[in-house]
UniProtKB/Swiss-Prot annotation:
Designated gene of the protein: sfsA
Protein name: Sugar fermentation stimulation protein homolog
UniProt-listed InterPro entries: SfsA, SfsA_C, SfsA_N
GO MF annotation, one: DNA binding
NCBIfam families with a match to the protein in the record: sfsA (TIGR00230)
Protein family per UniProt: Belongs to the SfsA family.
Source organism superkingdom: Bacteria
Signal peptide as annotated in the record: none
Disulfides per UniProt: none
CDD domains according to UniProt: SfsA-like (cd22357)
Pfam families: SfsA, SfsA_N
């Protein structure tokens, strides 16, 4: 999978003002930027280099969208608004020739995709790691837990289900973050035992392209 998404400029992150806004030094000026990610984003710290895309609308209070933040030797893509686009490209490669529909409802949830009217797909983006282990979530997520419970329910109803996890930073394997959200971790392992397929893909960003480079394994829980 390769998706072109060039950043328009680079800045220096200064502070997070609210859930969706932050301040960065852009072209020598303190500038309000939009953060399209509801997670805590622990890697978003003062002084980090960030990649930004100019907002398409001049009516917004924030003139720039945060795309990626510097972390060690790479830029980590953090704009969750592109998760479905990236996932859709990956699914086209995983299921060639299949009919892929987006935003399909099942019971009380709306899943990201439905493949050939029989496989529900939910997508999660991961931007946090510890000691080479990618972890999701980085903040408690009632919505995320509910989505996985509904995937389990869909399997019981005769459908197939896939949890597709996109890991945007260098990692060796993936684990649910039980320290941050024990309930999510429990339902994650229950989903595996209940027949929900879980695929984890590493996605890199170089300021020009988003590329899925490899499939990661699920770590053994300690």
């Amino acid at each position: 999978m390769r998706l072109i998404l060039p950043a328009d400029t680079e800045g220096i992150f200064l502070e997070r003002k609210s859930r969706f806004t932050g301040v960065a030094l852009v072209e020598g000026k303190k500038t309000l930027i939009h953060i399209h990610n509801t997670g805590r984003l622990p890697l978003l710290k003062k002084g980090k280099r960030v990649l930004l895309k100019r907002a398409e609308s001049d009516r917004r209070k924030t003139g720039w969208d945060l795309l990626a933040v510097e972390h060690r030797d790479e830029f980590v893509f953090v704009h969750s608004g592109f998760h479905s686009i990236v996932a859709g490209k990956i699914l086209e490669e995983l299921f060639p020739g299949s009919t892929i529909e987006s935003e399909k409802r099942f019971e009380n949830s709306r899943f990201d995709f439905l493949i050939d009217r029989r496989t529900f797909v939910e997508v999660k983006g991961c931007t946090y790691e510890e000691d080479g282990v990618a972890m999701f979530p980085d903040a408690p997520t009632e919505r995320g837990r509910r989505h996985i419970e509904e995937l389990i329910s869909s399997v019981k109803s005769g459908f197939k289900a896939l949890l597709l996890i996109l890991v945007f930073l260098e990692s060796d394997c993936f684990l649910p973050n039980r320290n941050v959200d024990p309930a999510f971790s429990r339902v994650f392992w229950r989903a595996l035992k209940s027949g929900v397929n879980i695929d984890v893909f590493r996605v890199k960003y170089d300021g020009e392209y988003l590329c899925s480079t490899e499939k990661l394994s699920i770590c053994e829980e300690v």
